[in-house]
Amino acid sequence: MEKNIPKHIAIIMDGNGRWAKKRGLARSFGHMEGAKTLRKALEYLTEIGVKYLTVYAFSTENWNRPQDEVSTLMKLFLKYIKNERKNMMKNKIRFFVSGRKNNVPEKLQKEIEKLEEETKNNDKITLNIAFNYGSRAEIVDAVNRIIKDGKENITEEDFSKYLYNDFPDPDLVIRTSGEMRISNFLLWQIAYSELYITDVLWPDFDEKEIDKAIESYNQRERRFGGVKNV
């Protein structure tokens, strides 16, 4: 039977620190390995026909981590943007960042905006990176913009237009490392997404693990709150 490939996959990339700790390495090594895994995952998902990939890279709560780790993550993201620019243009990957811009280093924010502009017409796959992102913050920001615009009698469709992007809702949400929680990720958008949780740590999440997640997705019956006709 032919596989049904999700149009939009969202991933909570968890376990970088634990991956490094198991090997007696600093947490920063886990984050660097996680960046390599993201590149491989993006290539494979593009190959099999996924159109949107949203990844949870840095939450609004992650500012509470040790300062040296936060600094490492900022530098790593800047390096990732610079290193992947040519690859994204070559493979027609659109780059987009969802999240608040406050606190993000100015140099990093400029590089984000530059790559978003350069890749805005790429249409093979969209890589949406949730960075300095929290879903409650996104909802609050949307409400404040609605109030500012003086809107009344807002529908769900109207509300969605005030979120950080207009991408379709995720079909499948994957969380690595075995944690059984959403962690303030896409609370509005994943109302009817299928969830897949694996004990595999993010740096070890390879093509075979992606296939397992999609196989599990294909075994689900998506009813969106309804019932199957008998």
From Swiss-Prot:
Its cofactor is Mg(2+). CDD domains: Cis_IPPS. It comes from the Bacteria. The active site is at residues 14, 62. Signal peptide: none annotated. Substrate binds at residues 15-19, 27, 31, 59-61, 63, 65, 175, 181-183. It holds the Pfam family Prenyltransf. Binds 2 magnesium ions per subunit. Homodimer. This is Isoprenyl transferase. It comes from Fusobacterium nucleatum subsp. nucleatum (strain ATCC 25586 / DSM 15643 / BCRC 10681 / CIP 101130 / JCM 8532 / KCTC 2640 / LMG 13131 / VPI 4355).
